[in-house]
Amino acid sequence: MMRETGRRLLGIGARARFAAYSLFEKKSSGDSNFAPGAEKYILKSPDGALEVTVSDGRLTYSAAVGKTPVIEPSEIGLLVQGGVNLGENAVLGEPKTDSREEVRRDPDTETDITDRHINYIFPVRSKKFRYSLEVRIWNDGFGFRLLFGKDTGLLISDELTRFNVPGDTVCRYQTDLKKMQGKTLTQKTSELSQSEVFSCMTAFEFPGKSIYIMITESDIENYPGMALRSLGAGRFKTELWDTDKFFIKGGKTPWRIVTVCRSLEELVHCRVITHAAAPISDKIYENADWIRPGKSAWSYFIDEEHSRRFEKIMEFNALAQEAGYEYNLADNGWRDWAKTERGAFKKVKELVDDAEKRSVGIWLWQSAMDKVWFTPYRRRFFKKCQTLGIKGIKLDHIESETQFMTEFYRRFAREAAEHKLMVIYHNPQKPTGLRRTFPNVMSMEAIRGLQCKADADNDTILPFTRMLGGNADYTPLCFSVPRCLNEVSICHMLASAVIYNSAFFTVSEDPSILKAHGLDSFVSPLPVIWNETHVLTGSKIGEIVIFARRSGNRWYAAVFNGSQSERKINLPFSFLKDSAKYEAEIYTDNLTDQRGYNKVKITVTSADSADIAMRPSGGFAAVFREI
């Protein structure tokens, strides 16, 4: 219902507004000076290893690493009114080139990261129409988009851009376009079927060549989201899956992104999606000390009825305080605390007052299917939340990528920031770099998390696919609910809390249960900011993940075993600081009891290692505290 509403609104707007604009009547400024350039341009990354070729005629691009093609010649096209394809009969002008190296603070690692890229802007003439093609190349990927003059009006009926991937690769994809919670499937690219539609963040591995690519998008503004329609044998077409015709005036298309990494270590550090997003430009984010990462207690996952019981959420205030969590999330059901919304908000005020005494902040759930669509109600809602002392909003049930909805993500985040409210999105679109533009967007779901039950096989893929988009609200650790634990071990669950990062970290297990099982000493001090991350030797997509991560002077190690068989590995502690001693708190699988685990504390140095035996779908977790 929500998606169809968006389509109707967009259709009316497009017809009403388009009457004022003509596709061909206006030419961009300086058009008379357009000078054709070469028929083909070979563009290089800053390190020279990645080459992107752009050709005119039928506008196409391709890419290669060394002598290995990673994208074969593929069309860039946009179908507008009158059946005109802007990529046909295209003539490229000489590009403007800009090399940049920008250093900025990353809020999720609290370190400086470098955005080093070369940017090319080509003027393009296509019949009587003028626009620009922007191509940006990083060492670990590239993107392209179309730019239009401010007076250009377009009624877009389809995007014809393609991504042709070599068939001798392995494809990893899922087909849940609404929520990105589908099971990740693995198949030879040459054997992919025709007409199936994949979500973005579809990834490809080049066997024997240590090359990994992923196709997605970034920086969506006034444009619907895309998916990938398989045409068979590694050929894909952009699919604007959640919209019909739509109108834009001026502006730009989203970045069409291809990440290109040459190791798993490089892959998990790839920031291309974030780099491509528009930087912060709003003064409301200056001195934003109200944006505070942290862990949150969450009663809903253990029992959905908990959120409807005011006394239970009050109890979780105390549990959050005892566990050292920064937040407590009141999920779906809080409006049942009274007969009216006004009465429910009075109860929320009681909850907030109690939480403040305990140095705990309250987050509040809100459905996108509710009245927040309407600007007056949404603004009153935000104002009320700020007045009550709410710290953040969990917006749920989105499940759409219409032009209206992708704009709603941005509008909701900005208006929330005006009231000093953080945000997470559930059942949302793919991650597209929103956190860079709107730093109060702490996380989003868009992942097959614990809600869909633990999946050891999937867990050995997602750190190398979905996590390239940034924070994911996986909601880890709920082992007391059998359907969530599924076949994985307790140590696999602990590892998920280390490997999946989220600035708003929702702990789905009851803190009292964690304490009763002796796991609070690991979970309570668990950081949500990781200053350093490494993929360790032995990791293999779809089989095993071995991570080492540092926060301050503490190191963590975590392992996912994706196999249905026991697995033994030797884990060197060489990631630790040389000449330092650490107290290691180590958690290993009980090989005969899925719900059991072994815990030891020993003193180690970087010269030491551990022999680890894991259950089928098992895992390993350890924390190293410098002494």
Regions found by a protein language model. Name each.
Residues 1-28:
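Membrane-proximal basic amphipathic "stem/tether" segments
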Residues 30-279:
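N-terminal accessory beta-strand-rich subdomains and adjacent acidic, glycine-rich linkers
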Residues 108-114, 522-547:
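Edge strands and adjacent loops of beta-rich recognition modules
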Residues 251-327:
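An acidic-aromatic substrate-binding cleft motif
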Residues 332-489:
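Aromatic- and carboxylate-enriched substrate-binding clefts and catalytic-loop regions
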Residues 491, 495-534:
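Catalytic cores of secreted or luminal carbohydrate-active enzymes
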Residues 540-578, 620-621:
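Carbohydrate-binding surface patches
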Residues 602-627:
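C-terminal beta-strand-rich structural cap/linker in extracellular carbohydrate-active enzymes
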